[in-house]
């Protein structure tokens, strides 16, 4: 296993930072300071060292620093050095990662590893951030799409190929629906050969998506069940989508692929009239049940819901930390400690230490991280910049 840990992080014209450098040297970090000081901006920068839009889901234009009167965000960059993989011949020099845009308003970001421009997916070979933010506080009250997005990020952390399958599925889905809606509006039949080809692509990508979700869910459930000694609520997980259910009961990928393609072909008139596809892995949902209280998570208190989600993220981190062929995750926990009681804050600190992972945590009050003192780097975030404490 390659231990994923940041040795340094440098932001240039990113959000509120003109330029800032943090040097954790592989240690966990707790960031504290007033609301609006820029703590979450640092976590967002780390989250962009992975494919996708990061923990805020922002566009590239939004993250560039913008001064009053400027119409668009500036060109920005995030650079980091990470620990190199340990091999039989020792450890190499640190790996240099970088991402950003070279022109203000650019719609595509550049990714470089050791100075070489590479596809964003290559970042997953070196760091795999997993995050939990206040935006997930309403996870059980939001639409199913938000829970799918949350769960798919957990899947991706363990199986980076999942993102490619999801992108291929979404692209084919858009093409198919454009054909069907155009046909419905014009009254002319859609190109059947083209539709069949698209549905074959949807079947292939959708079957892989459903299988990866099912595989991740079973592994996560086993991990959660083994964590009964932690002071976090136990969860029972379920995937409600029909295609994920097939994967969960052991139906082969080829069979799911064939069934999904056939179901889509049969649903052409219905989907064209509805203006959306009514079957497929894009319709599934994640259900979480509080075991000890025997009730759905949506019916639990806000505090218990947050603890359930945190335990789910920690279970995924623990599972991935034992992987033999991939870097372990970097945990990004935004304003999580503030919602935990003293016992759970202590347990969270112990868990991070025991797993040997690098974690970045934020909070307004330094006292929230008393249990991490001596085990993590404390950094005060203010309008003056980043100030590392000396009590590590």
From Swiss-Prot:
GO biological process assignments: DNA replication; DNA synthesis involved in DNA repair; double-strand break repair; SOS response
GO terms, molecular function: ATP binding; ATP hydrolysis activity; single-stranded DNA binding
Cellular compartments annotated: Cytoplasm
Main location: cytoplasm
Classification via Pfam families: SMC_N (PF02463)
SUPFAM superfamilies: P-loop containing nucleoside triphosphate hydrolases
Chain sites annotated for binding ATP: 33-40
Keyword field: ATP-binding, Cytoplasm, DNA damage, DNA repair, DNA replication, DNA-binding, Nucleotide-binding, SOS response
Keyword DNA-binding found: yes
Signal peptide stretch: none
Cystines in this chain: none
Annotated GO CC locations: cytoplasm
Similarity comment: Belongs to the RecF family.
Biological role: The RecF protein is involved in DNA metabolism; it is required for DNA replication and normal SOS inducibility. RecF binds preferentially to single-stranded, linear DNA. It also seems to bind ATP.
HAMAP family xrefs: RecF
Protein name: DNA replication and repair protein RecF
Species for this entry: Caulobacter sp. (strain K31)
């Amino acid at each position: 296993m390659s231990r994923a840990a940041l040795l340094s992080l440098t932001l240039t014209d990113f959000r509120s930072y003109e330029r800032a450098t943090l040097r954790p040297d592989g240690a966990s970090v707790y960031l504290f300071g007033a609301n609006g000081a820029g703590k979450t901006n640092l976590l967002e920068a780390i989250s962009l060292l992975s494919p996708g839009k990061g923990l805020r889901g922002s566009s590239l234009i939004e993250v560039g620093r913008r001064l009053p009167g400027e119409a668009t965000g500036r060109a920005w960059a995030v650079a980091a050095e990470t620990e190199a993989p340990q091999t039989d011949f020792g450890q190499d020099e640190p790996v240099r990662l970088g991402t950003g845009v070279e022109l203000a308003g650019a719609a595509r970001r550049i990714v470089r590893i050791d100075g070489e421009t590479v596809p964003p997916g290559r970042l997953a070979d070196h760091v795999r951030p997993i995050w939990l933010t206040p935006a997930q506080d309403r996870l059980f009250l939001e639409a199913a799409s938000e829970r799918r997005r949350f769960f798919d990020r957990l899947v991706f952390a363990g199986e980076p190929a999942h993102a490619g399958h999801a992108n291929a599925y979404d692209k084919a889905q858009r093409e198919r629906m454009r054909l069907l809606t155009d046909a419905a509006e014009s009254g002319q039949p859609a190109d059947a050969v083209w539709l069949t080809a698209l549905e074959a692509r949807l079947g292939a990508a959708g079957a892989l998506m459903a299988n990866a979700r099912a595989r991740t869910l079973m592994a996560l459930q086993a991990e959660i069940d083994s964590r009964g000694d932690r002071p976090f609520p136990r969860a029972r997980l379920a995937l409600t989508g029909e295609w994920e259910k097939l994967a969960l009961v052991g139906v082969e990928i080829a069979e799911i692929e064939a069934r999904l393609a056939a179901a889509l072909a049969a649903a052409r008139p219905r989907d064209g009239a509805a203006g959306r596809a009514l079957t497929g892995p894009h319709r599934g949902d994640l259900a979480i049940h509080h075991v000890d209280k025997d009730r759905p998570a949506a019916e639990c208190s806000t505090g218990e819901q947050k603890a359930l989600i945190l335990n789910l993220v920690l279970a995924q981190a623990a599972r991935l930390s034992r992987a033999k062929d991939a870097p372990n995750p970097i945990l990004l926990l935004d304003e999580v400690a503030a919602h935990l009681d003293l016992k759970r804050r202590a347990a969270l600190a112990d868990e991070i230490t025991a797993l040997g992972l690098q974690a970045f945590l934020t909070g307004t009050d330094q006292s929230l991280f008393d249990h991490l003192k001596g085990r993590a780097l404390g950094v005060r975030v203010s309008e003056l910049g980043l100030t590392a404490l000396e009590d590590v």
